[in-house]
């Protein structure tokens, strides 16, 4: 796996799924291929994206700044600086300075990532802030190692939280999760259907699922009732995906 592929993988792991994720993936690919060379326009686009957390925007802004060639005097962006200040916690800043001193002696991506993984996400973000604000300088490889370590810390905590939701025994949460998954899968099918021969069938299955979810939410149902919806939709999807040759996300 090349260095830039690895960076793209880690950064995208902290971006919520949806159309915006696909858009960000495309921007990263363009930036890494040297196609997107206007940093100002790119940063303005990033600043106005909805859904993304300030920290995710800060990390993406840091990656874009590292990768896109720019004028030396180009102003640093406030939204990136604010995101990479470690929540203003002096403890994070102290640790960031210690980490920076270690990284300064490092020259490889993997070496930097290994060192950085022993620090908290707050300290890692503060260290990125030091480099972003030109208070310290490291090689691009080392900076990317720092980025990937930060994303790994964030993705780990997101995964723990997601696993808790998926394995919860609370029937109300499981019920709502099934309905949300049914709705998002229906939406994905409608988007995919545009160019396929089976478009009418896909739209029909998606529409039925959507109506069922709407009815359940309106009249209220027993938390176990959505299990049937999940099974029916899954059966329809599996038949559809065999013909389409597409692997759909499985329901939990």
Swiss-Prot record:
Outcome of mutating residue 148 to S: 31% loss of RNA binding activity
Record key words, sorted: Host nucleus, Membrane, RNA-binding, Viral matrix protein, Virion
SUPFAM superfamilies: Influenza virus matrix protein M1
Main subcellular localisation: virion
Effect the entry attributes to changing residue 155 to G: Complete loss of virus ability to be rescued in a reverse genetic system
Short sequence motif named Nuclear localization signal, residue ranges: 101-105
UniProt keyword annotation of Nuclease present: no
GO terms for MF: RNA binding; structural constituent of virion
One Gene Ontology cellular component: virion membrane
Role of this protein: Plays critical roles in virus replication, from virus entry and uncoating to assembly and budding of the virus particle. M1 binding to ribonucleocapsids (RNPs) in nucleus seems to inhibit viral transcription. Interaction of viral NEP with M1-RNP is thought to promote nuclear export of the complex, which is targeted to the virion assembly site at the apical plasma membrane in polarized epithelial cells. Interactions with NA and HA may bring M1, a non-raft-associated protein, into lipid rafts. Forms a continuous shell on the inner side of the lipid bilayer in virion, where it binds the RNP.
Family designation: Belongs to the influenza viruses Matrix protein M1 family.
Assembly information from the UniProt record: Homodimer and homomultimer. Interacts with NEP. Binds ribonucleocapsid by both interacting with genomic RNA and NP protein. May interact with HA and NA. Cannot bind NP without genomic RNA.
HAMAP family, alphabetized: INFV_M1
Protein name: Matrix protein 1
Native organism: Influenza A virus (strain A/Wilson-Smith/1933 H1N1) (Influenza A virus (strain A/WS/1933 H1N1))
Gene designation: M
